[in-house]
Curated annotation (Swiss-Prot):
It comes from Stenotrophomonas maltophilia (strain K279a). It is a single-pass membrane protein. GO terms for biological process: protein transport by the Tat complex. One of its GO terms (molecular function) is protein transmembrane transporter activity. GO terms for cellular component: TAT protein transport complex. NCBIfam families: PRK02958.1, PRK04561.1, tatAE. This is Sec-independent protein translocase protein TatA.
Amino acid sequence: MGSFSIWHWLVVLAIVLLVFGTKRLTSGAKDLGSAVKEFKKGMRDEDKPNAQLGDESRTQDASRTAQDEHDRNAR
C-alpha cells in the first residue's frame, strides 16, 4: 500500500499533461536547462583569477567605447 506502481505514475503523468499541456512543460524544461547552464557558467567564472576577469572587462569596455564613438560619428 505504501509503494506506487507504474500505473500510479502513468496516471499522475497523464493528469500533469492534461493540466499543464505539453507546450508549458517544454518551455519550462528549456527555462530550467538555461538556468542550470548559466549557473554552471557563473561557477566557472568564479574560479578564474581576478586579473583575468579584469582584463576581459577592459576589453569589453574598449569595444563598447569604440562602438559608441562609431554611433556618434554616424549621426
